[in-house]
Amino acid sequence: LFIPRLPSSYVIDDALYQKIFLIANAALYPRYTVLKQNSAYFIPLNTEDIHVQRALFFPWKVGISKRLVISDLEQFVSAKTSRLIPIMENLSLDYDKVTSMAIAGNSGSGKSYALTYFLTLLKPISELIIVDPKFDSPSRWAKYHQVTVIHPKQNRSKSDFVSEINEVLSQSLQLIYQRQAMLYENPNQKFKHLTIVIDEVLALSEGTNKAIKDAFFSLLRQIALLGRATKVDLLLVSQRFDYNSIPVSVREQLNVNIQIGNINHKTVQFLFPDLNPEGIVIPIGKGTGLIQIIDNEHPYQVLPLLCPTYYTKKGIL
């Protein structure tokens, strides 16, 4: 808490709050991580003295982000018994509370490496449909694990490829409607997750026939808006998530946002539009960046991220 005494010679505003954040975050590192707020956070104090009845509050957590190191990913997954997905040493994600996830990052930042980790951990707890426009590591992972994958074929155009994706998305939307009817009859009905994984979303929407692109966006929008209660989830990967890659309404439904690689005002503007990354201590190295988990368990503020380091079967990555 920072308790200003009024009247004061300085203005108590957002600029003051951010200056104190910069000082406190550097001074408390690495024992504590001060969580970045988009604007000043005031709380009332239990006192009758009007001069000190309010304080600036700075949310924080003990320690700093630490990378998880897994010597054998397959063995690690087989030993797991819960739906928790470990992200870092002191951060796990309950997949039952996930609606949609997004992983963004520039080329070579480690997006595919992070995606392979999530795919391996999701396989025991979710059905998977993988869309891989690059025909790269997600396809190799899917082949090894015998999972459905949609990838480009030599004798088909890009519009044919996106039309095939639309057909699968339409089937998933029908599944949502079926599950909604089942929930209407029995509100306690439990479903297994169905996760639709789309790598390089931007590659699908750019240069595609407008009617097919509009149908693709419409299906994505409906699945993102309706899939939460019926456990139909999206896991989207792209270099950036501007309005050309996914509709704004889909981006607003994302409750796990991951930005990997170079962090600055331009790179975070789509997943974290209100965030000024100044002052956030982001470690150097591959697979580092920011993560935001929006649920009732984690602080909604953005946290520094170090993606797990793991070892898996040769030939997948």
Segment roles from a protein language model:
Residues 34-50, 61-84, 202, 209-213, ...:
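N-terminal helicase ATP-binding lobe
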Residues 15-24, 238-315:
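Conserved ATP-driven motor cores of ASCE-family P-loop NTPases powering translocation/secretion/packaging/pilus
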Residues 8-16, 185-189, 242-245:
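Short acidic, glycine/proline-enriched loop segments that cap or flank alpha-helices
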Residues 122, 189-190, 307:
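Short hydrophobic "helix-edge" motifs at membrane interfaces and signal-peptide entry regions
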Residues 180-195:
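Short helix/loop segment immediately N-terminal to the Walker
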Residues 102, 193-198:
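Structural motif
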Residues 2-4, 56-181, 202-255, 259-262, ...:
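P-loop NTPase catalytic phosphate-binding loop
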Residues 1-58:
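Long, basic/Gly/Ser/Thr-rich N-terminal segments
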